[in-house]
């Protein structure tokens, strides 16, 4: 936990720059209302070092060069220091402010191609959209942005990959341009990876107006995050548990002047039992604010949260049927359970040079298959909850930049993450929940692009496959080349040898368990031991914590276990 005096001193010192920044804003707007200020490009890290397939090097390689603070300082926006505004109401919306569903407007689809400028977006942000390759707004953006620009609360329902992030980010940035303040907006996300991704989009979309953002998530150093908050960013992107920690323990930090609150992936936020923490957060921010809630589904919990936190919202919907996109080709490969690894290697060999995500059910299989593939010459890297936060970000960065073409991941990567060019999604373990399947395959065929998915089906998985087909409303086809048993079995001896080597490696390092439960057998040594899968956010969400996790988080309040 950061020391209060150090954090307070930093925050006090940072306020001295506010008055000088105000004059810059006036000059910038007076010179040309439509001219774009200097572009401030957010920094990115790139890791290119090689790995040799060993567990310790897999994880340490992934940890390279990732930092938790994202800030893009520019000349476009300066801050009005209104944190101590006495008019800010700290009370949360009363529970009796229920919204009659008949009064919630639903906007119909029109399918019309429009430009961002047609939606009322200012030239500075249109320029940023162009720089990011956004040619036209997506349907959810067409519907949500004009309503949000009119300072209305918004409920957005859209499937994964529909462009929800820009739909709430653009109106916030435009309001910030008109009325720049520190701690102007806060975005809540259910996972750390999604929080970092949102922060990157905020900085990219705000690069032409000099937006500063901070990412506040569990698994990272509290002191460093306190320093980031002392710089008074315009936008905070956070996971609920760690944000609540800072509100309670970081001296000088508050959200009394907050203007915008966004809850992204709200259904998942509530599925992870963050509801009590969100209730506390709502009591720490002004009632007079704009609130946006985005979700893939309108569950009972989401509807309850809507009534408690939004005022007279407009409801915008796009493709609310829970299904896969039409540009996705979905296949299966049928095989004996005993030769599952061999079929996976055969598939990876057939798809060499393509970007592939392999989804597993357990941490053990994620790590084992990553090592197995590396031993056979495939550039694979793992992503799972037992990696440190820096390692998880590093793994994503390597996969996004092409340093590794195969990402072997648990469901930590199945939702919310926008990886631009994923050619193929492989379900090594078929998910038991149809929604999990939809989110997994949603990592490809995004934003109108085409993509493929292949589900590995053994004699034990036929019923699960049929259940998924019933939900998505189509029959999967057999993957071309998947029935060439002779070609597959030629690889069996080498795959079996690589499997034995991978299991020995895992046993030596104590990662996962031979039974595939995915839980740690003992404290991981080296850089593995610095992270706990069940840290701040999971603890506050009421999820179980290992003994090691409690021991390594001595700074956490005892009541949050």
From Swiss-Prot:
Keywords recorded for this protein, A-Z: ATP-binding, Coiled coil, Helicase, Hydrolase, Nucleotide-binding, Nucleus, Ribosome biogenesis, RNA-binding, rRNA processing
One of the GO biological process terms: rRNA processing
Ligand binding (ATP): 158-165
Biased composition (Basic and acidic residues): 100-109
Record motif Q motif, residues: 114-142
Positions of short motif DEAD box: 264-267
Keyword Nucleotide-binding recorded: yes
Oligomeric form and interacting partners: Interacts with the SSU processome.
Protein name: ATP-dependent rRNA helicase RRP3
């Amino acid at each position: 936990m950061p020391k209060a005096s150090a954090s307070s001193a930093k925050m006090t010192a940072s306020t001295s720059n506010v008055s000088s920044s105000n004059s810059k804003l006036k000059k910038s707007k007076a010179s040309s209302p439509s001219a774009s200020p200097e572009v401030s490009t957010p920094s990115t890290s790139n890791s290119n070092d090689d790995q040799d397939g060993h567990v310790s090097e897999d994880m340490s390689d992934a940890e390279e060069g990732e930092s938790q603070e994202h800030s893009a300082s520019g000349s476009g926006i300066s801050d009005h220091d209104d944190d101590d505004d006495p008019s800010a109401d700290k009370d949360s919306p009363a529970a009796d402010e229920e919204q009659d569903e008949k009064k919630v407007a639903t906007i119909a689809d029109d399918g019309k191609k429009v430009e961002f400028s047609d939606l009322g977006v200012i030239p500075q942000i249109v320029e940023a959209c162009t720089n990011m390759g956004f040619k036209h707004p997506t349907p959810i953006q067409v519907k949500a942005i004009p309503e949000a620009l009119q300072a209305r609360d918004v409920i957005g329902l859209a499937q994964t990959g529909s462009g929800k992030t820009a739909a709430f980010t653009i109106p916030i940035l435009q309001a910030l341009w008109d009325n720049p303040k520190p701690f102007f907006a806060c975005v809540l996300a259910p996972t750390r990876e999604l929080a970092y991704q949102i922060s990157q989009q905020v900085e990219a979309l705000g690069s032409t107006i000099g937006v500063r953002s901070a990412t506040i998530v569990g698994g990272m150093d509290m002191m460093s995050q306190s320093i980031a908050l002392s710089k008074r960013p315009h936008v905070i992107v956070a996971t609920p548990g760690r944000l609540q920690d800072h509100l309670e323990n970081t001296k000088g930090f508050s959200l009394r002047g907050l203007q915008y609150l966004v809850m992204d992936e709200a259904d998942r936020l509530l599925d992870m039992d963050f509801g009590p923490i969100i209730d506390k957060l709502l009591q720490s921010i002004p009632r007079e604010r704009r609130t946006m809630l985005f979700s893939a589904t309108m569950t009972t919990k989401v509807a309850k949260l809507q009534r408690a936190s939004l005022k007279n919202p407009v409801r915008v919907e796009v493709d609310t049927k829970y299904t896969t996109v039409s540009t996705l080709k979905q296949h299966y490969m049928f095989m004996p359970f005993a030769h599952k690894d061999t079929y996976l290697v055969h598939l990876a060999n057939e798809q060499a040079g393509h970007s592939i995500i392999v989804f597993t059910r357990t941490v053990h299989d994620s790590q084992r298959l990553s090592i197995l593939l590396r031993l056979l010459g495939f550039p694979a890297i793992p992503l799972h909850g037992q990696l440190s936060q820096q390692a998880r970000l590093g793994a994503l960065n390597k996969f996004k930049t092409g340093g590794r073409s195969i990402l072997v991941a648990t469901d930590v990567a199945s939702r919310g993450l926008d990886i631009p060019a994923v050619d193929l999604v492989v379900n090594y373990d078929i998910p038991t929940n149809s929604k999990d399947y939809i989110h997994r395959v949603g990592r490809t065929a995004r934003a109108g692009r085409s993509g493929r998915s292949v589900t590995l089906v053994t004699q034990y998985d036929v019923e699960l496959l049929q259940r998924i087909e019933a939900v998505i409303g189509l029959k999967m086809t057999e993957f071309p080349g998947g029935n060439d048993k002779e070609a597959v079995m030629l690889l069996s001896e080498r795959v079996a040898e690589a499997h034995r080597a991978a299991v020995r490696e895992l046993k030596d390092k104590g990662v996962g368990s031979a039974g595939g439960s995915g839980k740690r057998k003992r404290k991981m040594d080296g850089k593995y031991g610095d992270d706990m899968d069940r840290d701040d956010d999971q603890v506050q969400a009421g999820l179980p914590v290992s003994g090691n996790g409690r021991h390594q988080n001595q700074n956490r309040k005892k009541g949050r276990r």
